[in-house]
């Protein structure tokens, strides 16, 4: 038997992050249990039959379909996001692929923003077309480009905002209105903003996807993804077919790790932003850096939109460009003593990477340039260290 405290509609984000989705077993444990099992037993053959044909009460039948610990994570994240439903996946890319695949089919059409993470770009430019889906990428900040692309029918619109790694901010409400007129579902990758800062459903999104590997875990421990939505019919008739039969299921242990990560998400995001804001201003003063891209800076091209769309804050990621190109970027990375070189992000530890040669290495050079990625660009995921230590590390590396 499990016991549960029902979530209140008045609970705020921090409370939902800690209390949402808690279901205790008969042992009444304080910390949620990890149900490390693949299958479940039945009292009779008739009960097993009823569990599979849908005539019996809802229950767990196989952890590829659903698992108690995974279900707790899904419920907590849905409460925090303000969504009716959530399905967890093995990784963020699994979430992106399954969400888009459930929106379209051979002969369909998907429109996306041009500035995308390398694997997302590959899905839209290579994988979907392989299955007969027409795709088109547009400048996400150009309203006229969206109007033109969505002047004809589409199945889905996919966008990252802020984008990885260029931190472009896209007007979700504007795109959603156009997309719905074109018959498309709007799928928003909300990884960089997190559910703490940005609420895509309130702006017209139909589906929100996450790499839970990033801020939701926040400590580089595990992989995970999530698909959030309100349309149960879409789930039952489309999404669940992919999730059930292709097996992108989340490990119960990873679900438990992510469930506990959610408990401190709002605290960590606040700290990331404090450090990132101060560090962005500091980097703007360094002569070796030709450009600092941070939504919280007034110099950001979409600063006003970012402040409106992201709860008045800029997030925990910074992009910067060094005048000396790749050589200067590599020199900075190689001389860092505190900040790690890593392609992950959203970690308690500050991490830096060179997108041209890592996350977007397999993207053709001309496409990288079109996205706004240069050989001198670095992406900095600002962690939770003391801000003065971060400043000193970057200053020393810049001045070798």
Give the positions of each predicted feature.
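Conserved C-terminal alpha-helix-loop-beta "cap" of PLP-dependent enzymes
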Residues: 289-378, 382
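Glycine-rich beta-alpha junction loops
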Residues: 22, 36-42, 192, 214, ...
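Acidic-histidine catalytic/liganding microenvironments
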Residues: 80, 283-287, 336
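N-terminal "arm"/small-domain region of PLP-dependent enzymes with the aminotransferase-like
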Residues: 2-67, 75
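PLP-dependent enzyme catalytic core of the Aspartate aminotransferase-like
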Residues: 2, 125, 134-136, 147-148, ...
